[in-house]
Amino acid sequence: QGRPSFCNLPAETGPCKASFRQYYYNSKSGGCQQFIYGGCRGNQNRFDTTQQCQGVCV
């Protein structure tokens, strides 16, 4: 598979309390899904749009 390894990481909200709508690649379903990002830390499996997510991970 040609997708980056970070695409297999789980969605990670992080410890901060903000509420940003972001998208992550769900390796179980094989598609991009929305999640709420807290604004800090987290991991690389986080995108501003579903199109960005699909472009990198699908």
Swiss-Prot record:
One annotated Gene Ontology cellular component of this protein: extracellular space
Keywords carried by this UniProt record: Disulfide bond, Protease inhibitor, Pyrrolidone carboxylic acid, Secreted, Serine protease inhibitor
Pfam families linked to this entry: Kunitz_BPTI
Gene3D superfamilies: Pancreatic trypsin inhibitor Kunitz domain
InterPro entries reported for this sequence: Kunitz_BPTI (IPR002223), Kunitz_BPTI_sf (IPR036880), Prtase_inh_Kunz-CS (IPR020901), TFPI/VKTCI-like (IPR050098)
Residues annotated with Pyrrolidone carboxylic acid modification: Q1
PROSITE patterns associated with the record: BPTI_KUNITZ_1, BPTI_KUNITZ_2
Disulphide-bonded residues: C7-C57, C16-C40, C32-C53
Function of the molecule: This is one of several isoinhibitors of broad specificity that are secreted into the mucus of the snail.
Protein name: Isoinhibitor K
Organism: Helix pomatia
